[in-house]
């Protein structure tokens, strides 16, 4: 892998997807234009797209493990402008709303725990 892309990826992960593109470029020892071009060539995505995916995965993981999490609190914690911004981005990447995903996660967790109890009792 290109060391510039590796440094950029590390900076984006370290910043949980909230690091501005200009700071990612600085960490990668590149200009913004060069970094954007390399990202697009290697992955087909922009730096901003990848940052958005990093944040989306954090929201998804939080909601999977804690379906009752407060969306406004998550939005603030993960650097979204507001809850509506979080919801739009979540739907963009997953095709569903964060609230619907959380409800589904809660149902699945309940089903898994019931299956486990039935397995242990058998």
Identify the function of each model-found stretch.
Residues 3-49, 67-78:
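DNA-binding recognition helix and immediately preceding turn/loop
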Residues 22-25, 30, 58, 62, ...:
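Generic alpha-helical hydrophobic packing signal
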Residues 50, 85, 101-103:
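Residue-level detector of family-conserved "landmark" positions at structurally sensitive sites
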Residues 64, 89-122:
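…primarily DNA-binding HTH/wHTH and HhH modules…
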Residues 8, 12, 39, 43, ...:
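Short hydrophobic clusters on alpha-helical segments that form packing/core surfaces
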């Amino acid at each position: 892998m290109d060391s510039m892309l590796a440094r950029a990826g590390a900076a984006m992960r370290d910043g949980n997807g909230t690091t501005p593109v200009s700071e990612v470029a600085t960490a990668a020892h590149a200009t913004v234009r060069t970094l954007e071009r390399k990202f697009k060539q290697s992955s087909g995505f922009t730096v901003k797209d990848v940052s958005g995916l990093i944040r989306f995965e954090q929201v998804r993981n939080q909601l999977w493990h804690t379906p009752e999490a407060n969306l406004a609190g998550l939005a603030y914690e993960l650097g979204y402008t507001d809850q509506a911004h979080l919801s739009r981005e979540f739907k963009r990447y997953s095709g569903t709303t964060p609230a619907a995903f959380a409800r589904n996660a809660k149902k699945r967790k309940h089903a898994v725990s019931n299956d486990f109890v039935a397995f242990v009792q058998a």
